[in-house]
């Protein structure tokens, strides 16, 4: 008789996804980030739940409630530090996961890839509304600046901004709804993750050489379950070290000051993981143009599968595109640096060049290099 895990309607689903899943035998550590993202999501939902038990979403008490969590709640300081720094690890894993997808041509699984881009947008949205909740100076002014961007929408912009604010400025109504969104979105992310996996398991995983691996598959458990476990240990160790030794390393000192609508901070900037997009936004002098560039800096990922010209899937055997890939990585680092710098010479021009290069790589240089490599191999 077949075992329960293969027959039980519910356990069978988990078995097919986590135990008996046929997996390419040669996938490297770059394939660990999917499960690490799952771990990040679970960690964030759990720590967030415990924070929500003590947090109050009212402008008169929000800041003090966070102080109360850190001072008076049992291990509240730890829960808060893990939650705040867990967001940074979430984005590190997301960017690594996307980079892996770009490098090895995983984007050719179009449904999985597009759901992934939607997931990225959802996570970015969640992080943004979450950053507003402590109601510090950078929370308030970050919310003001970013929500104000919607006023660039023609005809209905101003109405849209006031609708999101729930008034004529970022105020109590804004904080309350942002808390509601911040609580709800992670569960939508969890649901979208299930769809992401559903589409992935329709095709199976890609692998480093980009060839069909049906002839050489091994079961997920115990091989990759233990490999994932090693990744979990490394990431949790790194997160714990950051949360215990330098919890404020990645935060903004402005956020230790309660929100004050009458005092604007000298430099308004988002958390480090949004700086690249912020740099692209700022590099265009026109408001609507900047907003569109900001939006397209993420949505450009959706056109990557359509612009794939190479006869090979990944970049393992494609040196020209490899060079362009690492140029993209360097470009992202430069944009991140520029996003945190004041708007003055030479940062303005560096940001503009880096922004043009960012879009040129995705829309022109990658497809061109793929075509060129086909020609070089006489495959075209």
Curated annotation (Swiss-Prot):
It comes from the Eukaryota. PROSITE patterns: CYTB_CTER, CYTB_NTER. Keywords: Electron transport, Heme, Iron, Membrane, Metal-binding, Mitochondrion, Mitochondrion inner membrane, Respiratory chain, Transmembrane, Transmembrane helix, Transport, Ubiquinone. InterPro entries: Cyt_b/b6_C (IPR005798), Cyt_b/b6_C_sf (IPR036150), Cyt_b/b6_N (IPR005797), Cytb/b6-like_sf (IPR027387), Cytochrome_b (IPR030689), Cytochrome_b_C_euk/bac (IPR048260), Cytochrome_b_N_euk/bac (IPR048259), Di-haem_cyt_TM (IPR016174). Binds 2 heme b groups non-covalently. GO terms for cellular component: mitochondrial inner membrane; respiratory chain complex III. Its main location: mitochondrion. Its cofactor is heme b. GO terms for biological process: mitochondrial electron transport, ubiquinol to cytochrome c. It is a multi-pass membrane protein. Gene3D superfamilies: Cytochrome Bc1 Complex, Chain C. It is found in: Mitochondrion inner membrane. A ubiquinone binds at residue 201. The keyword Lyase does not apply. The chain crosses the membrane at residues 33-53, 77-98, 113-133, 178-198, 226-246, 288-308, 320-340, 347-367. Heme b b562 binds at residues 83, 182. Heme b b566 binds at residues 97, 196. GO terms for molecular function: metal ion binding; ubiquinol-cytochrome-c reductase activity. Belongs to the cytochrome b family. The cytochrome bc1 complex contains 3 respiratory subunits (MT-CYB, CYC1 and UQCRFS1), 2 core proteins (UQCRC1 and UQCRC2) and probably 6 low-molecular weight proteins. Component of the ubiquinol-cytochrome c reductase complex (complex III or cytochrome b-c1 complex) that is part of the mitochondrial respiratory chain. The b-c1 complex mediates electron transfer from ubiquinol to cytochrome c. Contributes to the generation of a proton gradient across the mitochondrial membrane that is then used for ATP synthesis. Heme 1 (or BL or b562) is low-potential and absorbs at about 562 nm, and heme 2 (or BH or b566) is high-potential and absorbs at about 566 nm. This is Cytochrome b. The gene is mt-cyb.
